[in-house]
Amino acid sequence: MIPVYAQEHDFSSCRVLAVDDIPLNLVLVKKMLSRFNFQMETASGGQEALDSIARSKPDLILLDLMMPGIDGFEVIRRLRANPDTADIRIVILTALTSGEDVSKGFNMGANDYIMKPIIMERLLTSVVTQLSMVQSAKAQ
């Protein structure tokens, strides 16, 4: 069931990219967010995410940190260093729970940090908040 506050928004013009190297995590995130009408894509790693972003810039990225090759921290660093992608909203979804990791994520430019296992209400609240900010910025 989608909370009332989430039902009040039309996110049909928004693009969301979920990035995780574990396919089941991508399936779960897609299922949790399936009632929203935004366009959702997935990537199975950092390089695939960067390639997808280069083709079509998303409004929001749901990003795992621990991935082989290019990890989530490096994805954030590259996105924030590029003026064309520096404004993309990023929500970290990770099993890394130390205060150091949380601080590092925010210091690198993440907009929110959600620890796994993901609680659906927490994810919905974050997605609604981030996409509402995107829509407000586009309206100005």
Predicted regions span which residues?
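Short, glycine/charged-rich "phosphate-handling" switch motifs in NTP-dependent
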Residues: 111
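Acidic, metal-coordinating helix/loop segments flanking the phosphotransfer/catalytic sites
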Residues: 42-60
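Non-catalytic signal-transmission and effector/linker regions of two-component phosphorelay proteins
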Residues: 1-15, 30, 121-140
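Charged docking surfaces used in two-component/phosphorelay signaling
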Residues: 27-35
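A Lys-centered signature of the CheY-like receiver
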Residues: 116-117
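Receiver (REC) domain active-site loop signature in two-component systems and cognate sites
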Residues: 67
